[in-house]
């Protein structure tokens, strides 16, 4: 539950400057779109790095904790190393996916009185454009968070490898943060469709290097 609330809080904070008490009574056509604004925040690295940190805190830090508490020898008595690692990596992936999707949906529920889930249905949403001017836009919010989760999973895997070599919780979280920025900046010069920024921001049409405003 900690990870879900962390993700939801980050998502709400990322668009907090666009919400006000007065907006609750505004007509839907005057409200900002939750999907539009959350997608804008995912184009840049400011809040995306916080999602990586949240995922690392709840997953990668278990490796140094288990090593320090000598838990691994007891696990290996019941299973072999490969099975143990495969199960752990699968658990990390499943946790991140569930946490990101549930956290974004929770943020959407909180933001819904101040904003609207529907959007203009911009062509930047690609094949999902028909969904965006109806309540079905919640589906896109799920896809957006799933897309983000899939991009964070390999970052956490690399951070886990560092955490095994250097069993320290702070190193584990820092490794995830460092790996994220390496990917973010070193892929920045690649074509948009191949950049890490694109892969983590626009599941509808990742090849378009534009931001929805």
Residue spans of the language-model regions?
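Secretory targeting signals
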Residues: 5-61, 86-165, 202-213
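Hydrophobic alpha-helical transmembrane segments in multi-pass membrane proteins
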Residues: 12-13, 101-102, 183-191
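Helix-loop-helix units of permease transmembrane domains in multi-pass membrane transporters
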Residues: 61-94
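Extracellular/periplasmic helix-loop-helix junctions in multi-pass membrane proteins
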Residues: 186-211
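Short basic/hydrophobic patches in alpha-helices and adjacent helix-turn junctions
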Residues: 161-164, 180, 184
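Central hydrophobic cores of alpha-helical transmembrane segments
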Residues: 2-9, 169-183
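Short loop-to-helix capping motifs
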Residues: 1, 78-81, 167-169
């Amino acid at each position: 539950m900690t990870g879900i609330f962390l993700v939801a809080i980050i998502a709400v904070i990322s668009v907090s400057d666009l919400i006000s008490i007065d907006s609750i009574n505004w007509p839907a056509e005057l409200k900002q779109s939750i999907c539009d604004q959350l997608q804008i925040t995912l184009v840049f690295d400011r809040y995306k790095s916080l999602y990586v940190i949240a995922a690392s805190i709840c997953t990668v830090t278990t490796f140094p904790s288990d090593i320090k508490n000598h838990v691994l020898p007891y696990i290996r008595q019941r299973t072999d190393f490969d099975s143990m690692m495969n199960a752990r990596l699968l658990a990390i992936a499943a946790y991140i996916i569930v946490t990101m999707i549930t956290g974004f949906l929770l943020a959407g529920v909180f933001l819904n009185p101040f904003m609207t889930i529907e959007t203009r249905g911009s062509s930047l949403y690609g094949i999902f454009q028909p969904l965006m001017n109806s309540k079905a836009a919640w589906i896109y919010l799920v896809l957006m968070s799933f897309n983000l989760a899939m991009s964070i999973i390999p970052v956490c895997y690399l951070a886990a490898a560092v955490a095994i070599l250097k069993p320290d919780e702070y190193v584990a979280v820092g490794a995830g943060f460092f790996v994220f920025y390496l990917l973010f900046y070193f892929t920045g010069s690649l074509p948009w469709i191949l950049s890490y920024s694109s892969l983590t921001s626009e599941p509808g049409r990742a090849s378009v290097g534009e931001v929805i405003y």
